[in-house]
Amino acid sequence: MSYIGKIPTAAALTSSDISDGIITNAKLAQDIISGDTALGAEPADTDEFLVSDAGVLKRMDYSYIKGGGITVADQWRLTANLTATNGTISSNLEQVDTNALGSLGSAMTVSSGIFTFPSTGFYLVGFHGSGANASSADNMTVIIQGTTNNSSYANIAEASESSSGAAQEQIAGLSTQCIVDVTDTSNVKVLFQTSSFGSGSYLMGSTDINYSAFHFIRLGDT
């Protein structure tokens, strides 16, 4: 460029030299994203993204958009027949570990039959089992109890089976489930109880197959 008089001193371009909105999308390199270094791991909660909020460009932490999908799916089972017991199921319990069976995410923990959740959230809690009634014992009941204070428990789901009038042992399925809002893992817990079991009644158990199993699936945040 030609000048009349003295050539001006060179100066670096600064942000104040450019009006807002003057640089269009067409002026940006096509590899402005793909040409940069890949993160290679899940972002930290404080990592930021640019989003268009009703046409206004804003930044957002990853913590607001992460998640989705099931993060906990755990199975436990009764490893031996439970005979003529009315009360909390507290023994012969194991997390499933054979063949194609498995669990997802952090595991439940159990102590004296009381199950503790690995994290807060809404959980689908269920019992699905096989029970046997002797001809002299007409009923079997399995109850899910829950607490919100790690102390007092109340019935929250129940499954019953009756073989009244049967001349011989009857095998039947028992199934019940509920959704538990785990707002505090120290206080919100569940247990499973048997009730109305006669002297010849029992829940079936095995270390190799899920005859009587307990299921915990985290559905989402509380």
What are the language-model segments listed below?
Residues 157-159, 177-178:
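Contiguous, function-dense segments enriched for cysteine-driven chemistry
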Residues 187-193:
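Contiguous beta-strand segments of beta-sheet-rich domains
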Residues 47, 123, 186:
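Residue-level detector of short, conserved catalytic/binding motifs and their immediate flanks
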Residues 2-71, 110-111, 118-120, 135-136, ...:
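Extracellular repetitive beta-rich solenoid segments
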Residues 66-138, 146-150, 159-162, 200-222:
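Terminal (often C-terminal
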Residues 158-167, 194-196:
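Short, solvent-exposed aromatic-acidic interface loops
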Residues 165-187:
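Short, surface-exposed tryptophan/glycine-enriched loops
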